[in-house]
Design a protein with these regions (language model features):
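Residues lining hydrophobic/aromatic ligand-binding pockets adjacent to catalytic sites
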Residues: 1-259
Length: 259
């Protein structure tokens, strides 16, 4: 694998202090829905407490990604922009649900959403549901966005130098093992910038393998698998105290809800 200019690995959620998370990982998705992140002062503190190379990706509200016609769409977009600006996000992530299926109408509506989001940030699209490889690749190319795939299980469908991938955990206690991490590294061989979200356990191993195969020296931020608790797709709810704590929250004062 040729030396990559950037390899960013993280988990979809965190528990506790952002500074502790940033000692192990350098990539984080933030869901831009009220109650799913600290308030603006806490988000600003998150940005202040992480290294400069730490990358945030802001997940577009599900009501927008579902391409629903809602009267509060301007407010949802404004809130998402506030989150992205506060953490100086590099990415927008649009995750369309299974209800969004391949059609000319879906492509038009998705294109309109992409147009609303378009700014200096890159935009990634993660389709869930009935999109085959060619349909997803063609739509992503048409809209000028980066297609999110699970490169532990799927081959790449393009040769773009910038890659955003989600390694999905299937089943309780699922772990991304060394063999899967090596497959991902091989599929990222020709990329220059890699952004990897790891569900389930094994994110620390994935980061180590990717950095080793990219020829990047190891550092003291290598993650142990037990350093962070894994929440998978569960939701974190932040209370008002997060505004004062820079996003740090106590497990006993938070609760998780299934999506």
């Amino acid at each position: 694998m040729e030396t990559a200019s950037a390899v960013h690995v993280g988990r979809p959620t965190i528990e506790g202090a952002i500074a502790r998370y940033a000692r192990a990982f350098d990539f984080l998705e933030v869901i831009a829905e009220p109650g799913r992140h600290p308030r603006r002062p806490g988000l600003l503190e998150w940005r202040r407490l992480v290294p400069e190379r730490f990358v945030f990706s802001v997940v577009v509200p599900s009501a927008m990604s579902a391409l629903e016609h809602r009267p509060d769409r301007p407010e949802l977009l404004s809130h998402a922009r506030m989150v992205a600006d506060a953490v100086a996000a590099d990415w927008w992530l649009v995750r369309t649900p299974p209800s969004v299926t391949p059609s000319a109408r879906a492509t038009r509506e998705l294109g309109a959403l992409i147009g609303d989001l378009r700014d200096e940030r890159r935009i990634a699209w993660e389709p869930r549901g009935l999109w085959n490889d060619e349909e997803a690749r063609r739509t992503a190319e048409q809209l000028g966005v980066y297609l999110v795939r699970d490169l532990a299980r799927e081959e790449r469908t393009d040769d773009r130098p910038i890659v955003y991938t989600r390694l999905r955990a299937l089943g309780e206690g699922a772990r991304i093992g060394a063999a899967a991490a090596e497959r991902v590294a091989a599929r990222l061989a020709d990329s220059s910038d890699c952004y990897v979200t790891v569900e389930g356990a094994g994110a620390g191993r994935v980061r180590q393998v990717l950095r080793e195969m990219a020829g990047i020296p190891q550092d003291d931020r290598e993650a142990k698998d037990d350093e962070q608790r894994v929440f998978g797709d569960d939701e974190e709810t932040f209370d008002d105290e997060d505004e004062e704590s820079g996003g740090e929250f106590d497990e006993e004062e938070s609760h998780l809800e299934d999506e």
